[in-house]
């Protein structure tokens, strides 16, 4: 007798709707509760207007301590940025300035939170933003950015 177990994926976004890849620094995979540099795990989700799904989790053996101290010879941020390639938003309790700059250069937007919160709440907040008016950089990523057309403002009125 054999057994096959498969993960059943929830329904994805509607046709034509591009999901947003979101990374969340977590120690327990239930809460946003880690600093980016010291996170041993980072969960990645695809989020769209009406749903979300877990994609993967990245685990890291070497992390900086909570005070940001680490071996100067070892780059601990580079492997995290490589693993998160394709993510647009990266949520963490804290992100150091140099790490944030490297994220931005890699096309990611770091978002710092003051207090730990459930991952489900973070996903819900992203969905609310997607259903409202996302900032211009996200509209560009999602393919919904339309340059303003001011030509009508300059057309002459016919008398």
UniProtKB/Swiss-Prot annotation:
UniProt KW Nucleotide-binding keyword: no
Record-level GO BP terms: nitrogen fixation
Domain of life of the native organism: Bacteria
A GO term for molecular function: metal cluster binding
Keyword line: Nitrogen fixation
Function noted in UniProt: May play a role in the processing of the iron-molybdenum cofactor.
NCBIfam families referenced in this protein's UniProt entry, alphabetically: nifX
Family affiliation: Belongs to the NifX/NifY family.
Protein name: Protein NifX
Organism name: Rhodobacter capsulatus
Gene name per UniProt: nifX
